[in-house]
């Protein structure tokens, strides 16, 4: 955080960096009485004192100072004051989908910077998808040689080497961001199956969907497929220090499993009810493998739509499909005492534009006011159930959302979501919040972020989301 302070705060002022044992103009003090990730900034006539209980708190103090000095290039005067600030939730996350569309490393860093600036502490990196496998796995080179280039779109070829990923992890660590990798299983596996068809139920070549997903998922009946996935997780765990590994689990159609002799045999051998129970069994095998490595497994809420084979106690559920299933996954997860991350697609999926575009019909649009006033995830957190860890928001790259389109989908709506993740007190009325957003717009644009329309009525007929 001191490097961040020098780069983002002192560089805008005439202050010179010099460590002193006493009489410093800016003092950094560890104060264990402050909440985790909380901080206090006290401004005296001759001195600024910054206190925090941990690295996260100091990092967020720097991010606050960064906004205070925004636009300044010379001397700055602060009024004497005291500010104490701390987060509402322990899980504040941004998801970036690099599976469907590959982004340059500079782009990944840009959105890690953004997450830290908005006082988030997790970056959920969606690295595997039907349209692309983006993480180098040394034991299985064809995952990236073949699976990294199956897409035909503008930005659908490419992958990240393990060395590049290590650099990104360190870049995030310096900004108090933990990167949570997602290796999606058993569904959204077409890119992997294009490289290794034997991992599917019938061992046949697979077609790569231009969007959505197909019946081609990892076979849960083959021991070889389970060994493959565990070997992949070995390399993922060696690479990522995160205590959490996301294993996907969403949108896994069971048509092939229902016809597959290996899957039918597995259901009989394990005493399972059906293919839905088989997915629970499969998920439990993967979660238990992560447990043996001291990690927790996150699954999308689809895995708890049906009761059945129990998941282990290192399981976390991410509730997402509010549009299709309302709060079913949230309720079932809480019933089984699984911790929950709230990311209801209404209104945290920021690939949903403000107005219709391509496959996003009017029913899949929302604006800043919708987010601020009607977010089901915000309302769930307000219930203060200790099982609810916090909130995540997402930028999926369905329908060809390329790098140049990302900012205008995120901003300004992500500012409402970051406010809900962090702020515990009474919310401002929307009009006042919107005025604050407009006041801060120039600074975010100076920091390199492009704003899109905030409200539906702001969107002109000729506005181009792409």
Predicted regions and their residues:
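Contiguous, structured surface segment used for ligand recognition
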Residues: 1-89, 405, 421-455, 463
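Generic recognition of stable, solvent-exposed alpha-helical segments in well-folded globular domains
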Residues: 4, 110, 160-167, 224-231, ...
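Short glycine/serine/threonine/alanine-rich loop segments
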Residues: 15, 120, 177, 295, ...
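A structural preference for short, hydrophobic beta-strand core positions in alpha/beta folds
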Residues: 17-19, 181, 299, 342
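Feature activates predominantly on carbohydrate-active enzymes
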Residues: 34-246, 260, 285, 289, ...
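Conserved beta-strand edge residues that scaffold enzyme active sites
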Residues: 129-130, 185-187, 304, 347, ...
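Active-site neighborhood of glycoside hydrolase catalytic domains
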Residues: 192-198, 206-316, 320-337
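Flexible, acidic glycine-rich loops studded with aromatic residues
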Residues: 297-302, 309-466
């Amino acid at each position: 955080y001191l490097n961040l302070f020098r780069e983002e705060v002192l560089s805008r002022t005439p202050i010179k960096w010099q460590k002193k044992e006493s009489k410093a103009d800016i003092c950094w003090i560890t104060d264990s009485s402050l909440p985790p990730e909380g901080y206090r900034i006290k401004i005296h006539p001759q001195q600024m004192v910054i206190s925090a209980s941990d690295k996260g708190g100091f990092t967020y103090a720097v991010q606050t100072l960064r906004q205070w000095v925004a636009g300044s290039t010379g001397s700055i005067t602060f009024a004497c004051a005291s500010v104490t600030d701390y987060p509402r939730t322990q899980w504040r996350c941004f998801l970036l989908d690099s599976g469907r569309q590959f982004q340059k490393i500079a782009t990944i860093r840009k959105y890690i910077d953004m997450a830290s600036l908005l006082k988030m502490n997790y970056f959920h990196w969606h690295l595997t998808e039907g349209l692309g496998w983006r993480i180098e796995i040394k034991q299985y080179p064809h995952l990236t040689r073949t699976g990294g280039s199956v897409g035909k779109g503008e930005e659908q070829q490419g992958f990240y080497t393990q060395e590049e990923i290590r650099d990104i992890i360190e870049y995030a660590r310096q900004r108090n961001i933990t990167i949570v990798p997602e290796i999606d299983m058993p569904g959204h596996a077409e890119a992997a199956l294009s490289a290794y068809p034997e991992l599917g139920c019938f061992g046949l070549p697979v077609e790569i969907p231009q969007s959505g997903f197909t019946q081609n998922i990892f076979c849960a009946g083959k021991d070889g497929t389970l060994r493959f996935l565990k070997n992949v997780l070995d390399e993922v765990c060696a690479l990522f220090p995160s205590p959490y590994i996301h294993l996907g689990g969403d949108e896994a159609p069971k048509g092939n499993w229902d016809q597959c002799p290996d899957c039918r045999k597995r259901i009989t051998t394990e005493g399972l009810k059906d293919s839905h129970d088989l997915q629970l069994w499969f998920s439990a095998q993967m979660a238990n493998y992560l447990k043996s490595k001291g990690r927790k497994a996150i699954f999308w809420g689809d895995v708890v739509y049906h009761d059945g084979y129990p998941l282990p106690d290192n399981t976390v559920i991410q509730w997402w499909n509010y549009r299709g299933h309302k709060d079913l996954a949230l309720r079932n997860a809480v019933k089984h005492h699984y911790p929950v991350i709230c990311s209801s697609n209404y209104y945290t999926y920021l690939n949903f534009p403000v107005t219709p575009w391509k496959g996003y019909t009017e029913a899949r649009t929302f604006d800043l006011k919708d987010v601020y006033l009607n977010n089901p995830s915000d309302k769930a957190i307000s219930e203060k159930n200790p099982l609810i860890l916090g909130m995540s928001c997402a930028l999926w790259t369905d329908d060809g959302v390329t790098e140049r389109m990302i900012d205008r989908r995120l901003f300004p709506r992500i500012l409402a979501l970051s406010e809900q993740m962090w702020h515990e007190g009474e919310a401002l009325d929307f009009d006042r919040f919107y005025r604050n957003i407009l006041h801060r717009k120039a600074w975010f644009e100076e920091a390199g972020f492009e704003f899109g329309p905030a409200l539906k009525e702001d969107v002109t007929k000729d506005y181009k989301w792409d």
